[in-house]
């Protein structure tokens, strides 16, 4: 299977372009949103590490923004909890579409998270 990775800033057209290929698309932003809405284990980990900011499930963007704005170091803590869950979603996606000719990986932080060693294009 060919893996086509798209990365870029917010509003750069990744989602639009990824759908033009006609292959299954892994959208990391949707994965993250789904994790915040449905993954109680992630909520509990965040609440354990940052109890000042996380008070109810599902996780709200307001709580996330407050945690990040009040202390920039919190982004590393949040990322260390969220990114493994997104990687798990990505692995499940790749397993599901392993017989597909190609897949598109719409991942804004693709290079920053050093996932670029696992793509074809």
Regions found by a protein language model. Name each.
Residues 17-18:
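Post-Walker A alpha-helix
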Residues 33-99:
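ATP-dependent small-molecule kinase phosphotransfer cores
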Residues 4-6:
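Hydrophobic anchor at the beta1->P-loop junction of P-loop NTPases
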Residues 10:
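The conserved Walker
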Residues 89-97, 102-121:
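ATP-dependent NMP and nucleoside kinases share a basic, alpha-helical "lid"
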Residues 22-30, 40-41:
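Post-Walker A helix-loop "phosphate-sensing" segment adjacent to the P-loop in P-loop NTPases
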């Amino acid at each position: 299977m060919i893996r086509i990775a798209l990365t870029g800033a917010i509003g750069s057209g990744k989602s639009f372009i990824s759908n033009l290929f006609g292959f299954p698309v892994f959208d990391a932003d949707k994965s993250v949103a789904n994790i915040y809405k449905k993954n109680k284990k992630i909520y509990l980990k965040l609440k354990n590490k940052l109890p000042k900011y996380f008070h109810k499930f599902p996780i709200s963007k307001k709580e996330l923004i407050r945690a990040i704005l009040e202390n920039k170091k919190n982004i590393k803590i949040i990322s260390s909890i969220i990114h493994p869950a997104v990687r798990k979603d990505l692995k499940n996606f790749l397993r599901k579409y392993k017989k597909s000719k190609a897949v598109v990986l719409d991942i804004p932080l693709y290079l920053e998270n050093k996932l670029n060693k696992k793509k074809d294009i």
